[in-house]
Each structure stands twice: as structure tokens, then as C-alpha cells.
Amino acid sequence: SGISGLSAAYYLSKKHHVDLFEREDHFGGHSHTIDIFFDEKKVSVDIGFIVFNFQTYPNLINFFKENDIQIEKSNMSFSVSVDNTNFEYCGKGLSGIFSNKSNLFNIEFLKMFFDIIKFYKKSDQLSISNEKITLGEYLKINKLSKTFVDYHIIPMVSAIWSMPPYEASRMPISFFLRFFQNHGLFKLKSRPQWYTVTNRSRTYVNKILSQISGEHYK
């Protein structure tokens, strides 16, 4: 019962009696909030669904408006830190990429930096084809540096889809291109504004559950 199941049950329950059966230990599927303690304070963290934007998620936005779900601005940030090295950066502007000043003199890092620019510009303009090649094969064809592959694009794909690196490299290139183009992730400037649910995603999960007519089993 992720957002698709819950929204379907929500609309059906307006005219019918609907019972929910959930095989997991929580309702909401990918929209799952947990509480952790940091510096002796409880912090609520979304571990699946986190951000959305107005361009790509119009139906979700309308659904939130209908249910008076409060939202707030967020960002789609990305950072990498390689264990036991000084190799780290974040993707928020040049100050983030070169937050570690030693990166300015790191040849491998500079290769990655220029590959990011080249790869993003080319991929954003590339027409989406039905070629049955993987992301890993696409990266090899374009002769991108190992540093770019291992410390940028594969970690980013792994983070977005919550998958190990070897699975990320097997992703169909057509799917990868479509997702990144639709979400503006190839844009070096003028990226879409991202939003998140105020007080985390369980806020809307609980509100929707309270409006579904029948019993809730899990």
C-alpha cells in the first residue's frame, strides 16, 4: 500500500467500503518515516520517498492539495566521501565541489569534474532510444574516467534507486536517460525547485488512512 495503493483506496472509499491488507509492518510502502536519536534528540527521517517537484509530479501535488498536506522547500543534494582518502565533494555549486581545496590539484578529481560537464551536456540533449544497452555499457562507449564512474554517476544512481553499484550499472540506458531528463538532473543550472512533506511522509500516510472507510490489517 504505497502512494498508488493508498490513493486508489482513498478514492474508492468515497463510494465503497474498502478494507486494507498490508503484508509489511507499516502502511505507505516507499513512504516510510522512522525516528532516530541524534544528540539526544528525536529526529524523524524519511528513508524512501523524500522529495518531489511541481513539473514532474502534478497528480501528487493535486492529491496533497485535496488533503491539505503541508509541504516545504527542500533540495536534491548529492555528496560523496570515499573512506580512508581525502576524496570528497558535494554537488552544490563550485564551492561544494571544491570544498576540499586539495581537489584543485588532484588529477583524478579534475578528470571527474570535466567528465561531469561533458556527460551531463551530452546526455541532456540525447534522444531517448530503445537501444538495449545498459548504463555501464553506455559509460564505456563514451570513454568516461573510472573516477567519474566509481565516484559520481554509479553512486548517484545507487542512491536514487536504493540499489548496489553492480545493479546500477545494469540499468537500461533508455530508462536512466528518461528519468534524469524528466527530473532535470542533467541540468547544471536552473534545476527545478524540490519540495518535501512537512513533518515527513507519515503525515500524509496517516491522514489518508484515517479517511479510508474499512478495516486496516497488517
Q: Which residues does each predicted region cover?
A:
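N-terminal glycine-rich dinucleotide-binding loop that anchors FAD/FMN and/or NAD(P) in oxidoreductases
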Residues: I34-L60
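Glycine-/proline-rich flexible loop or hinge segments
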Residues: E40-F49, Y120, K187-P192
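N-terminal Rossmann-fold NAD(P) dinucleotide-binding loop
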Residues: G5
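Glycine-rich FAD pyrophosphate-binding loop
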Residues: S13-F37
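Mobile amphipathic helical/loop "lid" adjacent to a hydrophobic cofactor/ligand pocket
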Residues: F54-R178, N182
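Helical element adjacent to the flavin cofactor pocket in flavoenzyme catalytic cores
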Residues: F176-K218
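Glycine-rich Rossmann-fold phosphate-binding loop(s) that bind the pyrophosphate
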Residues: S1-G2
